[in-house]
Amino acid sequence: MLIAGDWSESRSGGVFEVKNPANGEVITELPDGGRTDAARAIDAAYGAFPAWAAATAYDRSAILYRAWQLMIERKDHLAHTMTVEQGKPLRAAITEVQYAADFLLWFAEEAKRVYGETIPSARPDQRFIVMHQPVGVVAAVTPWNYPVSMITHKVGPALAAGCTVVLKPAEATPLC
């Protein structure tokens, strides 16, 4: 599991198997995170929040744009992984990876459009200013059936808005 930018084992040392649904073959074993690991991830996300929230909209946009580029470059590999892990036909997996990447591109552009508002007041000496600000850590739990696109659909807007994220993928499709 990835916590605070580092790959780590679960504190319990437990693992679970990821299997190919077509033949039952074990693809890999991954750390079986528990409450302690979740708490570490949440603490790390809170620790990273001030710096990420302070990043400019253009900086966040550039990072999301780079993530989009990387997904496009690795589309075939990601689709193959999805096919082996989930059983989705390769053509459908390629389509999903493209769809998922496009969410990142969309939110890379939306990150630059976090506009505020000035609202007139009934009093001549006042006006109301609305500023959109990051709210904190976002918890994202994703399903097995559209694992890649649901990750980018949830993580993309959170990162664009300046929030940090703790992602819990479906146990059936943690590699996607």
PLM region spans:
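Conserved small-residue-rich beta-alpha loop and adjacent elements
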Residues: 117-176
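Terminal low-complexity tails and localization/encapsulation signals of metabolic enzymes
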Residues: 1-29, 62, 66, 116-141
